[in-house]
Amino acid sequence: MNKTFIGMGHSPDGIDIPLGLSMELVMRPQAAATFGQMSSTEKHAAIRYVQSGSTGEEAKRRIRNAIQQMENGHTAIS
């Protein structure tokens, strides 16, 4: 069973994925597969990376960058 939680409500893993990132993960199966293989620490780091954008445009750019890295199999997102 896939343990990756993408959606609304309480995440059983304690990780709340930003809506924009979750939407991209749903549309990008390879990125979602990589995200599912990431450790909890790596997932938290990726989410912090996305959320640390100072503007909405910066957050969108960070989401695109994170998705591209995950599509390439990278789990250390920066």
PLM-predicted stretches and their roles:
Residues 1-78:
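Charge-dense, helix-prone N-terminal extensions
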